[in-house]
């Protein structure tokens, strides 16, 4: 499942990549997408300096919706601010279900460091 801004979802960047890997990408319905946007841009959202309380509550409701209603097993935090609210984890309980939370920025950082390390070994540089 993907939790991101309306704009990020509309670009289809995550959906196309998932499809190329034969994975289904689900997104929140209109009501729950509004909650994601509220968690980001709302008066008590992360862009207003909040990382707990209301923004976390509504984001967790949207996450639970993706797991319960859409069958998501992993949730991508597709907005750079969302990992400030929810941490990356292999297993979070959401209602009666569970899912992994994926932080794309952290995943990218891990991959970049790994690739840089491999290049360094190949070139014999430290």
Segment roles from a protein language model:
Residues 1-126:
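Non-catalytic structural scaffold of enzyme domains
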């Amino acid at each position: 499942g993907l939790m991101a801004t309306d704009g990020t979802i509309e670009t289809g960047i995550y959906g196309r990549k998932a499809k190329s890997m034969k994975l289904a990408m689900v997104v929140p319905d209109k009501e729950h997408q509004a909650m994601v946007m509220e968690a980001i841009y709302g008066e008590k959202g992360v862009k207003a300096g909040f990382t707990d309380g209301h923004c976390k509550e509504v984001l967790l409701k949207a996450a639970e919706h993706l797991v319960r209603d859409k069958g998501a097993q992993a949730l991508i935090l597709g907005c750079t601010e969302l990992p400030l609210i929810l941490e990356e984890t292999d297993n979070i309980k959401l209602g009666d279900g569970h899912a992994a939370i994926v932080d794309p920025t952290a995943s990218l950082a891990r991959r970049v460091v790994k690739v840089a390390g491999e290049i360094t070994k190949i070139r014999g540089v430290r």
